[in-house]
């Protein structure tokens, strides 16, 4: 639960040294705060939460996490460009906060173009349900509170679909008697005078109430815990103040007390009672409240190395390849330092894999070897698995690009191995440009346009190579667009502006770092050379971006709104040891506005032995790294207002199974040998249909669309059959004929089906699959049985345990049947339908009105009964797929 309390307190600033990360290939060290200046590029974006669902009327905060070419990550939520592909279903603002408009599903995309004209984006699906609010509940119920104290209320909504989300920040809070008690927009009530008041939470036409009694009890004494603790420098110690009142009731008054440290050079205190060791020594910690006080002596010792983290964790490399491991030392003062070059590296089995003094692992022969990094009597291990595969081809992407002279393009080399697996080998290939007068390319695959013309960019490894053509244009700048437009900003806050250029050849590019930025009224707002604006005083100023004779402006309004409260999300998340969690801080201001203040607040972890904040000196990023199993309070504070949540760290997850390579079948929502039939009322979204061994006439029940291959029941997809003539039917690229495309699809379906029968899966031990899956919760793994399997007695819950890449494989020797009274599949903690595979040696029957998730590979028939909803894919290897008024959405 979040708590927000405003106080006057001293802000102690610390000078944090930026820790430089060593590059894998001997590049110059890069400071993450200057990525663009040092050639560090944005390589990917991850949007969380993944595929969320919420009832109409609520809001969903999305977070965008950027990963850079030097291996670092940072929260880019506030600088990314957010978009919804259907604003009639849901809208999203510039801070990633989405609001539903009507029931339906939309693609939410976060994109960012860095100063090298390198664009990355990520998309997730937001589902707005038509679930209606059936009940509201407030907790705690009918509490008592001493005058002058505060009480946090929580509102929980129960919806018609059975979900019960926390709606504390979505409801409207009110107090019937504000002379007795007040309540703010976050549900925090304050006792003003003796008496009682009805506290109401309302959402739409629904509301619920509870009674808050304010007593005249007076504070008799305060007790502090722990008593005389000792901590290492940099460690945070949480103190608790318990007040005993004249009526005999004891209350936690930690958040209401005024905290102080007698020697702030030794230890500092925040407003929530957390002390942080600054230097060696002792200081008296005092809590004051309502004329009472209590003290405790805090002793601070020197900082020490507390743990080592190795990345990547448990990697796989082909025989003959190398892999750079990184060792990060976590110190008690919260500093994370790259100790790769100073650690002592060793391999438990040098016949399988060796490791040099710089942490570079070489795969010698197939098998597994434990790699250890040791420093200061501490060590960390990871298991490197060497696979007996060889590189068969190299692909360079994106293909055939056109860029403007003077700009850059990041290229990626992907290797395909003899076992069909793919790997990003960008950093290990040799890059070259056929014409360096036109374009150059560095050893990280970053191509630069030098002069107009074209050049072949190649990536090679041994005798293998892949290439793409890069065209450099000398297009003229036609216009500039500044975004976001007509922004409102709270005084003291920052906002990143972007300038997008449109050239005479129709191309566009981010020129944010090459334009000249200006503010018409620098007393109201300033803006730096990179387009970062800062609100100085209430008023308006015109922000302008200029390049040559072209310019564009937008109005920036600065308000003097004050920060009322902070929300930290996600609330009380759980992650595994050695992983990370990105927190988002949202500020609620006195003018009713909300702003993403993730990069502005000060972040702290109450127990840095469990979790640290902002590793590698990514200042105020809100990124927590899990060090040990346990829990730690994560706090965000700004201007005397703070909020906290609890991060729970669990043990590392078991090995993740390898998923099959789908090849051409990945494009299909349904693929069948003999036929695909439906009754009226079916809807298929985001995937193609295919019949492998029969003519197009074996599609039954579908309504032909305007163009060849289209069905009215099929959205964002086409249907295919082996006898389709061309034209009017269009053969997918790169195939020369429809027959060739169908043959390849048949081959890829067989490969995936056979892979799912592998025992054991190359990356995880096979477990026995229960013959009844109802009322079970299963974690990732391979589940196998020779018998028939049913899902009928209840709901099957698949738990991703916080890893959105968790793979679930069910290999069934008979039939799979779901249906009443159970039959639903529920995905929690990051589990995704696209990573679930059902392989049956018989038929698969999906029960009436059930909700099914996963990719079905059935040897014979797939029968989806009336009203069932499927998120995944349906493949009938030798038979047909039968629908009956169903909704099928391909899992992407």
Swiss-Prot record:
Top-level taxonomic group: Bacteria
Covalent lipid adducts (N-palmitoyl cysteine), residues: 24
Topology in the lipid bilayer: Lipid-anchor
Intracellular or extracellular location(s): Cell outer membrane
Domain BIG2: 43-111, 134-205, 221-288, 306-386, 392-471, 478-558, 565-638
Motif (Ice-binding site motif (T-A/G-X-T/N)): 866-869
Chief localization: membrane
Signal peptide: 1-23
Site features described as Ice-binding, chain residue numbers: 866
Lipid attachment, kind S-diacylglycerol cysteine: 24
Gene Ontology CC entries for this record: cell outer membrane
Keywords: Antifreeze protein, Cell outer membrane, Lipoprotein, Membrane, Palmitate, Signal
Job description of the protein: Ice-binding adhesion protein that adsorbs this bacterium onto ice to maintain a favorable position in its aquatic habitat. Inhibits growth of the ice crystals. Has high thermal hysteresis (TH) activity, which is the ability to lower the freezing point of an aqueous solution below its melting point. The TH activity of this protein is approximately 1.4 degrees Celsius at 25 uM and little below 2 degrees Celsius at 80 uM.
Entry's family note: Belongs to the ice-binding protein family.
Name of this chain's protein: Ice-binding protein 1
Protein species of origin: Shewanella frigidimarina (strain NCIMB 400)
